[in-house]
Structures are given as structure tokens and as C-alpha cells.
Amino acid sequence: TITPNGITRFMAIFQCNNPTEIGSIRSARNDFIPLAAGFKSIYVHWGGEREALQKLNNGIIDNVDAMKYEGTVFYRKKGVPVPHNGFTDINKILDQSQKLNYNLENTFTGYPHEEKELKKNISNLASEVVVDYLDPYGVRWTYDRQDNIYKRERDGNPEIDKNANEQVSAKIVAVIKTTSTYLNQDYITVKTQGGGEAIIYQGGISIPGKWKKDPAHLDSKLYFYDNNGKEIKFLPGNIWVEIVI
């Protein structure tokens, strides 16, 4: 999602892969709460904006706040500048979640998989995806035909995963368009419930359509549909959602 001054913020969702080290962990955002709820996840954060923290402290969704467990579940990594130096690992999160009596069973239903070869034509080829965030946060994804993935660049440079020392990649890139409103002079809230336009990129092609998430239910699933109203099937692999306003 995006902050008022154009800085982009990540939210990582771990389901199949459990990395040993997770970070940097940053503050909770109001926009992320509906997304975390929709994926039936435990929301891990380091403090947060006032409205988001109020909701989380009232138990709107299961969450683990590093402000309460620094030095035990979370730690500050040496050599990494503040505030980017907050880290943890998946086992510590699972142990603390169990102590808090959170449900550790994954109940998210997932997305339908596309097992057939995607149909390509001159109108749907997509070797590149450009997301025009404000400088220096602009993003470019380039399709790697050999590995059938998209590789991420930020501000013209490859985005590197520090754990794997490899360029960040995704099997599917979903760009969803939405709107935002100001909470106050310091924070905006980006609409992550309701719906809007979307473009799905996978296998070197683009699929225009819509995203929908029922605004009446916080834990509703985030759906992706093509322009015929049919749910889009994804190639097996990781999905990166770019939210633009």
C-alpha cells in the first residue's frame, strides 16, 4: 500500500513457505487489516498508526505486536538502520500465537489454479509491467520467459531478496486500482474493500478485469475476475499484488 508522502509499504503473506528470518517488520496500517482478515492470517506488526492499533488492541483480528514482545519474540538486527531493523522468525511467531490461543489451522481456501497453457495473442502479450509509484519507488516487472516468472525492479535497480541473495520474482503480478481518503495530515487509508479495476499478469500475458472484496464482511476473500465475470485462474506459484491509487 501507499503512505501520504508516496512511500510504498509491503505486507508479506506466508502460507506454503516459512522463512527462518522475517523482516523488516514495520507498523500496522489501517489498509492492511481487511487484507490480513481475508487471508485468515495472524497479523504481525511493530506498533502502528493510531486507528489501526485501536482496532487491533480491541481484537478485530488475531495479531502479534512487536511493541509488546521486543527482546523475546522480536529483535533489533545489528547493522541495519532504524526503523528497518525489526526482525523475527516464523517459529517465534507460531509459539507466541499458540500462547495467545490463536487458531493456527489455515482455513484460507486459496485460488483456483490454471493447469492449461495460457492462450497468447498479439493483444495480450505482456513482457513488462510498469507501476508508476512516486520516485524513487517506481516499480518495473520484467517477464523471464525461461523461468516463466516476472522479476522486480525498484527505482531502476533489481529488487534483491537478502535471504536468498536473488532478484525478487513472482509467478503472478496483480495490479489493482483503488482510492484513498485522509485520516489526518499524517495518514491516509487506502480502500481495500469493495472493488475496482485490475490487471493480472502471468505467463507473459495480461488479463484485464476486476477485483472484489465484500465490504460488509471484514474477513471476506479478495477475488479477481476477468471482464466476463469469471474468476481468474492462476498459474501455481507466488502472487504479488500491487495496489495503486
Model features per residue range: what roles?
Residues T1-I245:
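A surface/extracellular/periplasmic glyco- and lipid-processing/surface-interacting theme
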